[in-house]
Amino acid sequence: MNDEYELLDSGNGKKLERYGNVILERPAAQAVWAPQFPDRWEKATARFDRVGGLNWEGRNRISKPWNVDIAGVTMKLSATDFGHIGAFPETRTLWLWIRSTLKEQIRKKGRELKFLNLFAYSGGATLAAAQSGAQCCHLDASKGMVDWARENAALNHLTEAPIRWIVDDVIKFLRREVRRGNRYDGILLDPPSFGRGKKGELYKIEDQLMTTLDLVDQVLSDDPAFVILTSHTPGFSPIVLRNLLAQFHEDGIFEYGEMLLTGKPEVNELPNGNWARWINE
């Protein structure tokens, strides 16, 4: 399986990553240690920082956009004004797990499974699920990001795959799904610390997450496979995420951990968010 992402180094509040043939230096506040490989930083194609604003150096040296394979999913990348590029590779191990788990559960249950991706961004997890043969629903409040995810679907030859593309506020959408009786076998949600819905609806994780999880529980099928909760919000540790899921699921298996940016074995891993999942077994 192709994977063209690699963490090259981190330290002094920054990270150095390779996306295909592009090497980027960007902020990583949690990297409070000294870099391991100082010479590698000179090879950066472009640099982004937030000192005195949002600034790219060398942005013109990046072909825009460019495509990279991450965990078996081809992603279109582009250097945005805010420093994001269209992929969060710390989630790639979750993509691998979602793909393999859904494929196995489809075989085991002998029926089609439905996967729901909430706050779905550019669609890496959606496309990994689609590659397993699952029916997918991809939801994000940003039309631009949903369009980006659809472009990624085309890059992966999944234009005709059974994927619903939804631009909407998560809570409004889930309430409609409850009323309509639509149910899902696997659900991933990556709520932001702060966000706005399609019509400006305010989403704050500390205020809306419990409501969201309650609605997620209501749209699960009678024989679901899993629920995955991830977060980049400080304070929402793996144990916190696990405990949140445990309020809605007494039985089953709970797994949790940090999301990590990784490279070759000698490179320090860089934590970048947390995850927890409930598995129905």
PLM features: what roles do these ranges have?
Residues 224-281:
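C-terminal catalytic and target-recognition region of SAM-dependent MTase-like enzymes
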Residues 122-134:
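Conserved SAM-binding loop of SAM-dependent methyltransferases across substrates and taxa
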Residues 135-140:
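Conserved SAM-binding motif I beta-strand of class I
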Residues 207-223:
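A short glycine-rich, Lys/Arg-flanked "PGG" loop and its adjoining helix->strand segment in the class I
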Residues 142-188:
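S-adenosyl-L-methionine
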Residues 89-109:
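Conserved alpha-helix/loop element of class I SAM-dependent methyltransferases that forms part
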Residues 110-121:
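Conserved class I S-adenosyl-L-methionine
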Residues 2-20, 24-89, 96:
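Non-catalytic substrate-recognition/targeting regions of SAM-dependent transferases
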